[in-house]
């Protein structure tokens, strides 16, 4: 504050940090204060007072009264406001994108297909239109709208750039959605695509553009006609297949963004979805990007090594899972040296799924103990499904063969 008061008006105009809060026309300063007592008397002296909670206030002070106000015993602390910036204003530079978009390299995505497999897109958003108002979206496949699926697929409806342009030329939103009825209800896909490829036409001087503002776009809205159903991995596989096939057809390099995911599987890359993604990533020139980190601290997964008694006793170790802390210690002390694996189930959860994956060659047996202490007995590792009742809890069990490429076997 002292530095701003000492600076000239020319210096303040050149440095936003110095000019923040100063009005050169009214010669007033806006300041933030913490105070004690009553500040009502300041209104009579030409100071506008806006009282906040917990003895904070915003003052609009004539420049001639600044020294007087700062010396008041009622003012515990005074602070000059600071300019705010959009938090994403520097996202491109801190992601090291700006250097590759300088005049020498000019890598803005021209000639590249960028596919967004998500919740859809607001195709009328200016960031996804060229300067002449036509769409940058080559294909839009909405899997939730039955009727006109792409060739080779059996769900949803696909819309071409020509159809989207006809919709954009409509005079009303009602006419537009009658031609191309796809909507991004949640807005997630639109936001993701804006980060990846928005051209900034909706912001002044294209300041808020995405990473590849000149890329050609392919959009797939995952889902079902029933909005209550969640998208499935089978639909995700078809979406990726659709995008890769189109890129091969038009002979363009392709980048696919996937922001969907789940917590199933052994996380060893052996599921059919994972092996398929690995396989198609080698076709043509394509890069598949997935979201990560949203559940990094939720403890959804656990891995560990169980000590084997085979060398000392020749016995196969028994592993028991329990949600009862009291039962845990009792099980751990049994004669066959069982290991307790505790898992938590919230009181509000009426159902949930738990998968246990083991190395294929290892032999284990499992006993479940309910919160009430009811034991299932040793569950035999017999392939197939079984049903079990532990008090009020119904269990549906499955012991499965490992997939052809897997190194682990699962018990669900």
Segments and roles (model prediction):
Residues 34, 60-62, 357:
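Short hydrophobic/aromatic beta-strand micro-patches
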């Amino acid at each position: 504050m002292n530095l701003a008061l000492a600076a000239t008006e020319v210096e303040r105009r050149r440095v936003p940090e110095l000019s923040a809060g100063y009005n050169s026309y009214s010669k007033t300063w806006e300041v933030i204060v913490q105070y004690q007592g009553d500040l009502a008397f300041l209104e009579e002296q030409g100071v506008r007072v806006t009282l906040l909670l917990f003895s904070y206030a915003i003052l609009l002070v004539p420049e001639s009264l600044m020294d007087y106000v700062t010396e008041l015993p009622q003012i515990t602390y005074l602070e000059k406001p600071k300019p705010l910036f959009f938090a994403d204003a520097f996202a491109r530079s801190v992601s090291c994108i700006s250097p590759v978009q300088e005049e020498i390299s000019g890598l803005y995505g021209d000639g590249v297909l960028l596919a967004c497999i998500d919740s859809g897109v607001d195709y009328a958003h200016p960031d996804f239109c060229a300067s002449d108002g036509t769409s940058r979206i080559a294909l839009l496949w909405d899997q939730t709208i039955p009727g006109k699926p792409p060739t080779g697929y059996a769900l949803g409806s696909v819309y071409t750039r020509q159809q989207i342009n006809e919709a954009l030329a409509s005079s009303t939103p009602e006419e537009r959605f009658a031609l191309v009825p796809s909507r991004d209800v949640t807005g997630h896909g639109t936001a993701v695509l804006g980060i990846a490829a928005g051209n900034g036409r909706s912001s002044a001087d294209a300041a808020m553009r995405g990473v590849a503002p000149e890329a050609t776009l392919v959009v797939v809205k995952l889902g079902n006609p029933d909005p209550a159903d969640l998208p499935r991995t089978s639909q995700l596989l078809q979406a990726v297949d659709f995008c890769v096939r189109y890129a091969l057809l038009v002979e363009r390099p392709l980048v696919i963004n996937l922001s969907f995911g789940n917590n199933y599987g052994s996380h060893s890359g052996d599921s059919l979805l994972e092996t398929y993604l690995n396989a198609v990533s080698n076709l043509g020139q394509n890069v598949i990007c997935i979201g990560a980190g949203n559940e990094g601290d939720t403890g959804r997964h656990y891995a560990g090594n169980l000590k084997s008694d085979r060398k000392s006793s020749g016995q196969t170790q028994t592993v028991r899972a329990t949600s009862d802390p009291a039962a845990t210690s009792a099980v751990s002390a049994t004669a066959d040296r069982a290991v307790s694996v505790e898992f938590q189930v919230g009181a509000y959860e009426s159902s949930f799924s738990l998968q246990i994956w083991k190395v294929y060659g290892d032999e284990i047996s499992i006993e479940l103990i309910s919160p009430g202490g009811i034991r299932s007995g040793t569950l035999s590792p017999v392939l197939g499904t079984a049903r079990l009742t532990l008090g009020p809890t119904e269990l549906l069990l499955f012991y499965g063969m490992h997939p052809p490429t897997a190194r682990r076997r699962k018990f669900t």
